[in-house]
Regions:
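Conserved SGNH/GDSL esterase-like catalytic core that processes O-acyl groups on lipids
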Residues: 128-328, 414
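Conserved, compact domain cores that house catalytic/ligand-binding motifs in diverse enzymes
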Residues: 115-121, 128, 132, 269-362, ...
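Short beta-strand/turn micro-motifs composed of small residues
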Residues: 123, 222-224, 350
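Short, Lys/Arg-rich N-terminal segment immediately upstream of the first membrane anchor
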Residues: 1-4
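Catalytic His-Asp segment of secreted/periplasmic serine-dependent ester chemistry enzymes
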Residues: 26, 290, 352-439
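Hydrophobic membrane-insertion alpha-helices, especially the h-region
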Residues: 7-25
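Juxtamembrane proline-rich low-complexity "stalk" or linker regions positioned immediately after a signal peptide
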Residues: 27-80
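Long, contiguous interaction/targeting segments characteristic
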Residues: 65-83, 91, 95-162, 416-418
Length: 439
């Protein structure tokens, strides 16, 4: 094709797109889903006139027109507007400090000098790399004793800044995906199993040569990356058919069976486990075998379970009824964990502020304030503590300020490491202040 024809072709395409931008409103909404594109005015940099300014201009034009003289006006053109979904009001009792529901956890801390006290921190991608959990762990261990990073999966696909993990199989270092077959309760269907035996971390590695050749002889090397992650004992959670020995930072495993977790910890003090579940809504715990969870929580003296979920529901839902259904599902998970760990306290950390672009501007996703209040209400009704990360940050639009200060990423959703430290410190300070009030 000659250069002139290419130019004409491109010009026609651009003209067609410009025409669509002039005619179409800049977005199409189907149920709760929305597709956006820039209008012609935005592309050309033409200032956007506010709704108030438009109304004032219309009033001035109408005032300048002569009074009608029995003129028959045509029927106005019907404009189909995007339906606005009313967000229901959520009444929350703000007079009760939800830390009152952490009493059993606070009481367990008195025993930390003679026995192990375990805290589990479940969450979505906001806590990957040990983010936020690290600050909670360091503060609790500094005050009540304890050491080690706690639970680790056999194959760590998402690197942690606290512990560097490597796998050796068939005499050479391999990528986690090349190791024993992994199953995850929060993963795609092909990675799930029917028996519900995922273990306390919601994932399991199966050593079996028929699944992955050479996977019945594995070495896991787990090296702490800072002094705060040092430990004095190993714990291995696996089937009895899996044999192991430890040497320094290495675990040598052999046999055929399931490995649910490794743990670097101490025999007394506080152990805080980081359990991220990427892409998870938090509605998967009921798929994990009840007996398996109950046994771990009881035998490992789990006295606090932290759940940090909800953010993954926000970008894909604009309907309050959908958000309400998700919170209902989270309520079921809370009740399930309460039944598995009746002696433990539960703390729910709500989603942070999250931003989306609308007409070229960053705004808070409209469902976040609603979900935050629904979660707070649910927590009070289920007798669990609630920390509003959204309110701590400053409410709607606060993520933009965190971005400006280098605390949040360019996506307007995830924290930078500095932001995660700030949020983690805020959570543990809030917890410790409650403990001091109890005394």
């Amino acid at each position: 094709m000659s250069p002139s024809k290419v130019f004409i072709f491109i010009a026609c395409i651009m003209a067609g797109l410009a025409g669509l931008s002039m005619v179409l409103p800049g977005r199409v909404v189907y149920h709760e889903y929305e597709l956006r594109w820039p209008t012609l005015a935005e592309v050309l940099g033409i200032p956007n006139t506010s709704q108030q300014e438009c109304e004032e201009i219309e009033e001035e034009i109408e005032a300048s027109l002569p009074e009608p003289q029995d003129t028959i006006l045509p029927e106005p053109t019907k404009v189909i507007e995007e339906p606005r979904i009313e967000v229901p009001r959520v009444a929350v009792d703000s007079t009760v400090d939800s830390r009152v529901f952490l009493k059993s956890f606070y009481a367990s801390l008195d025993q930390a000098d003679t026995k192990k006290v375990r805290v589990l921190h479940y969450g979505d991608s906001q806590i990957e790399e040990d983010r936020m959990t690290q600050q909670i762990r360091e503060a609790l261990q500094s005050r009540y004793g304890g050491s080690g990073a706690g639970l680790l999966p056999l194959a760590q696909t998402i690197p942690s800044r606290t512990v560097r993990q490597r796998l050796v199989m068939n005499g050479k270092q391999i990528q986690p995906a090349q190791g024993p077959q992994r199953y995850m309760v929060y993963g795609p269907k092909r990675t799930q199993r029917e028996d519900g035996l995922y273990g306390v971390m919601g994932q399991v590695a199966v050593m079996n040569d028929s699944l992955v050749s050479g996977s019945e002889e594995v070495i896991a090397i787990c090296t702490p990356q800072d002094n705060n992650a040092r430990y004095n004992t190993w714990r291995i959670f696996a089937d009895s058919s899996v044999h192991y020995r430890t040497s320094g930072d290495s675990v040598y495993l052999s046999g055929k069976g399931s490995v649910y977790a490794l743990s670097q910890e101490s025999k007394t003090g506080v152990i805080v486990d980081n359990i991220p579940m990427r892409g998870c809504l938090g509605t998967v715990f009921t798929k994990i075998d009840r007996q398996q969870l109950s046994s771990f929580y009881r035998e490992q003296n789990v006295t606090l379970i932290i759940m940090q979920f909800g953010g993954n529901a926000i970008p894909f839902n604009r309907n309050p009824s959908t958000i309400s259904s998700i919170v209902k599902g989270l309520r079921e998970q809370v009740r399930y964990l309460q039944s598995c760990a009746p002696e433990a306290s539960i703390l729910f950390i709500g989603p942070s502020d999250m931003l989306t672009q609308e007409n070229g501007e960053w705004i808070t996703y409209p469902m976040i304030p609603y979900m935050d209040r629904l979660l707070r209400k649910m927590a009070m009704e289920e007798n669990i503590a609630y920390f509003s990360l959204f309110n701590y940050m400053g409410g709607a639009g606060s993520m933009a300020r965190w971005k400006e200060n280098g605390l949040a990423g360019s996506d307007g959703i995830h924290f930078m490491r500095s932001g995660a430290r700030k949020a983690g410190n805020a959570v543990v300070q809030w917890i410790l202040e409650g403990e001091e009030m109890e005394r």
